[in-house]
């Protein structure tokens, strides 16, 4: 386990990017070689505009972050009285000063696979190294004289514990005798229902509007890889918006004129917040309520990023009681959970919180298929194997025709060699005779590229699924594979785990594991079953590809290498069967 952790930590993201580029180039060589180096052998075949909304398009930051003494989270949590949160998926607390949701830990996910690893901290209070919290409040209009709760207000709770079976009410009464209530309830996963209430017990009308805000102080460390989005995410007016933290800094700075129209929006329903690779925190307004949305960057000693919305103006007469509802999701972006919320709570396009990429029409089905197989197999490694078999069955007709053509090409090797010897100095005549031979025997020299060409989008879709979906996070296979989303942990430089050596990062690419070696061997064996390319240069390049792919895939997720290896084994079996059948037919 220690060797595994050390090796995985040494493979930094720059190396991952280089590996990703290398495999793309290698696949391109396989598929398009004959196009890049052609030979004459063959010819390549808003609806809420009338509602009364708060006049401000930006939520004033109620709490400006200033340079302060950073304290451990435990010390900060001990300062104020809190309501504890306990569910099968979350632990944490709500700060009764300000009614701030600022303490959440994911119960089922750890930072690493070490036995003593801490659980993932999602939200943290102000005063810690990386504050990240959610506020709920009210703002008054113009010369509104009513006393409103703020971030210094001390709320009273009717219960000390928030659980799936026990909601809580936080209440505060102003000097004007107006009562403000915030009701929190939570399900067994990651969804909070939050209702803000106001009871006007004064003798005058209240003109106020609600706001909800997510704030993140300090720029979080991101993976910064082009196939993954981390930062602001929102769906307003059915338009998915993804902006990184630099975009907010450059275009939505609170201290400068707003540069981009995305910083403010009007809409109804949807969701908005911040996303990491595997986790996110988003506000989910009532789908029937119009809202003003804004996104901002600020800096008062530390960079801060906030997103939130304000609701419509409430004119509350004496004796009247109003409610403002909405939800908060704070947790892991698990596909089945997001799908359930989409269906049961009608949260639009909620599964798009997972970064499916440009080819979502492929990536989503791949993810759903693997999760479906996992439901029966109980192991994601077995699910990947089952998915590979399914793909082979779907592509069987194409692969069968391709392998038949390659088998015919292999059978024609002696005839092709004789033509080369017959016309050593007349290449044009030799090519004409070769074309006639191919036509007579029904062989296609480029047919072998077709199955590979079809596999490319499947390969990259699986890569994306392994990279961005939390289902693969720390998902074990069998034996030495403890995490299918990480590279094979046993490498040749550690004698496959027999030597305790912390391999330097620059040597990680040659610290080839067992699965990549198996993949390379199966690829080499598969090539041996194919006819040798007629062009000597092409033959040399193809001969090197198993070695290139072995090194390239050594740094990729074990689940991806498992897919490739199983796919090679199935291809070998299919090729061997077809060639045996053709040979038997000709005997």
Language-model features and meaning:
Residues 2-53, 94, 196-197, 209-226, ...:
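Helix-loop-helix
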Residues 5, 55, 150-153:
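Generic detector of low-complexity/intrinsically disordered segments
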Residues 6, 20, 49-52, 62-63, ...:
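Intrinsic disorder/low-complexity detector
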Residues 14-17, 74-75, 157-160:
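Aromatic/His-enriched, Gly/Pro-containing loop or helix-boundary segments
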Residues 26, 35-122:
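Juxtamembrane extramembrane loops of integral membrane proteins
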Residues 64-81, 88, 268, 300, ...:
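Non-transmembrane, membrane-proximal soluble domains of secreted or membrane proteins
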Residues 65-68, 73, 164-167, 178-179, ...:
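Generic structural signal for short, solvent-exposed loop/turn connectors between secondary structure elements
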Residues 82, 86-348:
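Soluble non-transmembrane domains of integral membrane proteins
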């Amino acid at each position: 386990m220690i060797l595994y952790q050390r090796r995985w930590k040494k493979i930094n993201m720059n190396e991952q990017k280089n590996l990703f580029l290398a495999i793309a180039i290698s696949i391109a060589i396989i598929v398009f070689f004959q196009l890049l180096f052609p030979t004459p052998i063959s010819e390549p075949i808003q609806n809420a505009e009338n509602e009364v909304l708060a006049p401000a398009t930006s939520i004033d930051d109620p709490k400006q972050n200033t340079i302060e003494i950073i304290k451990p989270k435990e010390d900060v949590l001990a300062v104020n009285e809190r309501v504890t949160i306990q569910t099968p998926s979350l632990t944490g607390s709500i700060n009764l000063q300000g009614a701030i949701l600022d303490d959440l830990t994911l119960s089922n996910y750890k930072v690493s696979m070490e036995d003593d690893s801490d659980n993932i901290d999602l939200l943290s209070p102000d005063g810690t190294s990386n504050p990240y919290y959610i506020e709920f409040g009210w703002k008054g209009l113009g010369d509104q004289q009513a006393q409103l709760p703020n971030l210094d207000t001390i709320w009273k709770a009717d219960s000390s514990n928030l659980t799936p079976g026990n909601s809580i009410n936080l209440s505060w009464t102003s000097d004007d005798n107006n009562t403000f209530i915030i009701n929190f309830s939570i399900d067994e996963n990651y969804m909070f229902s939050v209702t803000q209430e106001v009871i006007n017990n004064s003798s005058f009308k209240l003109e106020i509007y609600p706001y909800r805000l997510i704030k993140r102080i300090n720029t979080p460390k991101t993976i910064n890889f082009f196939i993954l989005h981390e930062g602001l995410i929102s769906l307003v007016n059915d338009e998915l918006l993804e902006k990184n933290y630099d975009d907010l800094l450059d275009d939505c700075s609170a201290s400068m004129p707003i540069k981009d129209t995305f910083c403010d929006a009007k809409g109804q329903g949807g969701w908005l917040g911040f996303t990491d690779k595997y986790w996110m925190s988003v506000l989910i307004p009532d789908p029937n309520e119009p809202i003003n949305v804004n996104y901002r960057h600020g800096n008062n000693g530390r960079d801060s990023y906030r997103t939130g919305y304000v609701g419509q103006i409430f004119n509350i007469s004496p004796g009247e009681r109003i409610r403002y509802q909405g939800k908060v999701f704070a947790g892991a972006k698990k596909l089945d959970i997001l799908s359930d919320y989409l269906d049961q709570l009608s949260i639009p396009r909620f599964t798009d919180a997972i970064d499916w990429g440009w080819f979502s029409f492929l990536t989503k089905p791949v993810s759903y298929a693997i999760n479906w197989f996992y439901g029966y197999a109980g192991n994601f490694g077995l699910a990947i194997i089952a998915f590979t078999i399914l793909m082979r069955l779907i592509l069987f007709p194409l692969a069968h025709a391709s392998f038949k053509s390659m088998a015919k090409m292999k059978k024609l090797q002696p005839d092709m060699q004789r033509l080369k010897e017959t016309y050593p100095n007349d290449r044009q005549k030799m090519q004409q005779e070769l074309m006639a031979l191919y036509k007579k025997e029904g062989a296609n020299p480029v047919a072998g590229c077709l199955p590979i060409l079809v596999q490319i989008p499947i390969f990259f879709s699986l890569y994306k699924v392994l990279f961005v979906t939390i289902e693969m996070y720390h998902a074990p296979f069998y034996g030495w594979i403890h995490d299918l989303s990480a590279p094979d942990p046993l490498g040749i430089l550690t004698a496959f785990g027999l030597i305790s050596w912390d391999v330097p990062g620059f040597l990680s690419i040659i610290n080839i594991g067992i699965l990549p070696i198996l993949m390379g061997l199966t690829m080499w064996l598969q090539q041996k079953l194919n006819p040798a390319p007629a062009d000597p240069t092409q033959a040399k390049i193809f001969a090197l590809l198993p070695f290139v792919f072995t090194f390239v895939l050594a740094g990729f997720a074990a689940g991806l290498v498992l897919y490739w290896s199983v796919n090679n084994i199935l291809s070998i079996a299919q090729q061997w069967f077809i060639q045996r059948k053709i040979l038997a037919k000709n005997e």
